[in-house]
Amino acid sequence: METYHLEQAARRRIAGRLLPFVFLLYAIQYVDRVNVSFANLRMSADLGFSDRIFGLGAGIFFVGYVLFEIPGAIIVERWSARKWIARIMISWGIVTVVSGFVHTAHQFYTARFVLGVAEASFFPGMIVYLTHWFRLSDRAKAIAWLMAAVPSASVLGSLLAGWLLSIRWFGMAGWRWLFVVEGIPPVILGIVTLFYLTDRPAQARWLSEAERNWISQELEAETTVKKKIRSYTVWQALSSKRVLMLIVPSVLAQIGAQAVIFWIPTFIKRLSGLPASRVALLVALWGLLGIFGMLLNGWHSDRTGERRWHASVLSTANY
């Protein structure tokens, strides 16, 4: 009974401290990644960009992202999640602010590519970080909390964009302020991350000694079991049939998802003729249901211990 109470106390304390914070970080990251879709409601007209220029600029982000995604995740595992995530946030915040001052297509392409490099490995790094704190039986709920930041960011980002696009401070267009204003929070939160996050349970002064020992032993036991089954190098993992079977549907799903995310504000505006503020409100609506769905799916996956169908059915229904 004493062990049970210790376990429950440790799990609550870890979840209560880490999950709201990583949720906030990912929400801010996602807002900054897709804010260009709302900026485009005014930006392309102001700068004379064609749809081709905007589409290439939106997509070139992922070239930089893919190149540095895996190396960054390895750094999180082998060095320090706290320091690396802080570095990511500060650098992407600065690049986002600078994006508000582009004037040419080449400047736009460069800003998007560098933003991809700056943000690369944030999401996989977060997943790796959560494995340092949550047992396998708790991991789906933790990841669901993280993923719920995406629809939440859609709601927050849409409402904020609707307001920012309507302003014109100091003679500067609202879409420029959209980048500047939304680039400041990650810089601040990056600094906060250095002091707030803890890399490993053994370093957590905010846990009691008994709680630190319990979670460390639980995670170490899981690691030992996995190593006995098989230990993979990075290249072995990337060439694994199971990994490839996950990569292919994920890539296909993201092709559709990112196309919708980057173009839906423009499509709605062209089809409806509504002002930017109304367009932003319509885009925000789907996020409200997404928050509920992700948290419910993660909770039910942990409750039943089933992963495959919870991932595949929801993904198929979504896309």
Give the positions of each predicted feature.
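Central cavity-lining transmembrane alpha-helices of secondary-active solute carriers
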Residues: 59-74, 284-297
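Conserved MFS/SLC helix-loop-helix module at the cytosolic interface between two early adjacent transmembrane helices
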Residues: 67-106
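Cytoplasmic membrane-interface "Motif A"-like loop-to-helix N-cap segments
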Residues: 77-89, 302-315
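Helix-breaking motifs and short loop linkers at transmembrane-helix boundaries and internal kinks
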Residues: 48, 80, 101-107, 118, ...
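Cytoplasmic helix-loop-helix junction between adjacent transmembrane helices
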Residues: 111-149
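Glycine-rich segments within core transmembrane alpha-helices of 12-TM secondary carriers
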Residues: 140-165, 169, 185-186
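Extracytoplasmic gate region of multi-pass secondary transporters
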Residues: 36-37, 235-297
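Extracytoplasmic
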Residues: 17-51, 157, 260-265
